Amino acid sequence: MEENLADNSEREARPSKTKRKKEMHALQNIGESLVRLDSRRLIELGLPDTLMEAVLEAKRMSKHGALRRQMQLIGKLMRDVDAEPIRKKLDLWGNSSAESTARLHQLERWRERLMADQQMQALSELGQKYPDADLQRLRALARNAVKEKLANKPPKSFRALFQELQKIIPAATGERPGEGID
């Protein structure tokens, strides 16, 4: 009877096989993320030598079976490493990429509005939000970009308009054109 109690308490202290497998798959997924990173970011993580070598080896592999086995090895090596700082760093890099993409979309929306029929409204909104903006230059660039598009010419002013908007609109803002105006 006492042996059964000892066995039960030992089983409760140990995670179930399913839970262990989920943890191993999570570590292997982190390993897959490591393989997709560029070398500069890998160095920034400061991984142990054995793990770094395994990741670099996986980057060179092209055969599916060999790559799968290498990913399992990386998952196994990840067990000996504290994965939380690596996970946090990967999340941080993923979010910064998403923020960068969101900013580019925001700038593209402004450019499209400036080139559309509602140009005067868009210019007045830009003038209210960003008083330092050179509205006359933006209007000229937008007008030239529309002319280039209609004439099927290279999009020189189209690009220049985007670059001018990048200078005017700070990176920290995430608003959409037309939002936030009272």
UniProtKB/Swiss-Prot annotation:
Keywords: Cytoplasm, Ribosome biogenesis, RNA-binding, rRNA-binding. GO terms for biological process: assembly of large subunit precursor of preribosome. Gene3D superfamilies: PSPTO4464-like domains. It is found in: Cytoplasm. GO terms for cellular component: cytosol. It holds the Pfam family DarP. One of its GO terms (molecular function) is ribosome binding. Residues 1-25 are annotated as: Disordered. The keyword Amino-acid biosynthesis does not apply. Signal peptide: none annotated. The keyword RNA-binding applies. HAMAP family: DarP. Belongs to the DarP family. NCBIfam families: PRK05255.1-1. Member of a network of 50S ribosomal subunit biogenesis factors which assembles along the 30S-50S interface, preventing incorrect 23S rRNA structures from forming. Promotes peptidyl transferase center (PTC) maturation. This is Dual-action ribosomal maturation protein DarP. It comes from Nitrosospira multiformis (strain ATCC 25196 / NCIMB 11849 / C 71).
